Each structure stands twice: as C-alpha cells, then as structure tokens.
A protein has these predicted regions:
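Glycine/small-residue-rich loop that forms an oxyanion/phosphate-binding "nest" at active or ligand-binding sites
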Residues: 1-19
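Residues at the starts of beta-strands that form the adenosine-phosphate
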Residues: 20, 43-44, 73
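Adenosine-phosphate binding glycine-rich loop
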Residues: 18, 121-123, 127-186
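Rossmann-like adenosine-cofactor binding region
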Residues: 71-148
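Short, flexible coil/linker segments at domain boundaries that flank nucleotide/cofactor-interacting
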Residues: 15-18, 40, 118-119
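Rossmann-fold NAD(P)-dependent oxidoreductase module
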Residues: 8, 32-36, 139
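NAD(P)-binding Rossmann-fold cofactor-contacting core
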Residues: 40-69
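Glycine-rich adenosine-cofactor-binding loop
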Residues: 2, 18-38, 49
Length: 186
C-alpha cells in the first residue's frame, strides 16, 4: 500500500520528500502509507484517528517512526478534535484519507466536514477506489485543490510492485490503465 501510494503521487508530479502530511486513519493501509512516506523523507506526518483500538496502533507507529526516521516529525491526534484537524490541514501540503469513509455503499461519508479546509495548494489523496472519486475528492476538486485523486492509481502501483516482487518482471501497467479507462463507466 505504501509503495503504491507514493508511486501514485509521483505519477501525478508530487514527491513526499520535505512535505507536511495529514493522514486520516491508522489501519493497515494508513500505517503502510505513514511508514513509506516517513522513509521517503516527509517532513512531518500528523495522524488523525478516532479513539478506537487503532489509536494505540497509531501511537506505536509514531513512536517507531520517531526512532527510525528522526527527521520526520510524527504526531497522533484524536479525529474528534476538529479544531486541531483544521489547524494541521492548514499547515499541510498533502491530505490523505486512508479510511473506509466514502467507500461504497457509504459514498456520502467524508471525514472533512469543513470544506474551507480545502485550498488550491493542497494535494488531496484518497485510498478508496470504489467509487473512483469519493465525496472528499469531489469536494476538494470543487474547492480548487491543485490535485485531488482517488485510490485507483494506488491500487495499480501496489499491484505493479507485488507483480515485480513475485515474478521479477515489470507489470504491463499501460495495458491495465487502458483497460481501466475503457471500463470506467461500465
């Protein structure tokens, strides 16, 4: 997940190196993204998660990353603290939804309740790929964010990384992308 996420950003002209990030979520995909972005040189990662069993996991991830990647400041906050979320997003370069919010059959859900958090220089990325554009991505585009992308690219690039790992060969990604484009609205 982490490799696919970072590659998807790179394919859209965004490098995480030196960037301030806000990541919503602390599950498996979120943790992989946090770790990969820290390893790839993100300046800071602010993790927001509800005070559920995954919150302790987020705190553990932050502690480990602080030791392994001391140049990346990792902090954990309660998702219920909307003022802190707004503050952190205001200072972020990249906002990531790494939760199930917005995934079918709950397309109406978004964790960003205040659309004023979106601004033109903010990159918004979602791991959800069904639907191709979540409510968060749509609202970010409407607000004029320079880049707002769904999770299909992450899915492609994590698959390509796994394909190479298992076969030693490059996955024919152009063929897959063409197939996706042809079947997007079917």
């Amino acid at each position: 997940d982490g490799i696919g996420f970072v590659r998807n950003l790179k394919e859209h002209g965004v490098d995480v190196k030196g960037k301030k990030m806000v990541v919503l979520g602390a599950g498996g995909a979120a943790t992989a993204i946090q770790v990969q972005c820290a390893l790839d040189g993100a300046e800071s990662i602010s993790i927001f998660n509800p005070k559920d069993p995954f919150f302790a996991r987020a705190e553990s991830t932050a502690e480990k990353l602080s030791k392994e990647t001391p140049d990346c400041k990792v902090s954990v906050f309660d998702l219920a603290d909307e003022a802190k979320l707004k503050e952190e997003v205001a200072n972020a370069d990249i906002l990531v939804n790494a939760t199930l919010a917005g995934m079918k059959p709950h397309e109406e859900l978004t964790l960003i309740k205040d659309k004023s958090m979106f601004r033109p220089d903010l990159v918004v990325a979602d791991v959800v790929y069904n639907p191709a554009q979540t409510r968060m991505v749509k609202e970010a585009k409407e607000a004029g964010c320079k880049l707002a992308i769904g999770g299909k690219g992450m899915l492609l690039w994590q698959g390509a990384a796994a394909y190479k790992l298992y076969t030693g060969l490059e996955m024919p990604t152009a063929e897959y992308q063409k197939f996706q484009e042809e079947n997007e609205n079917k």
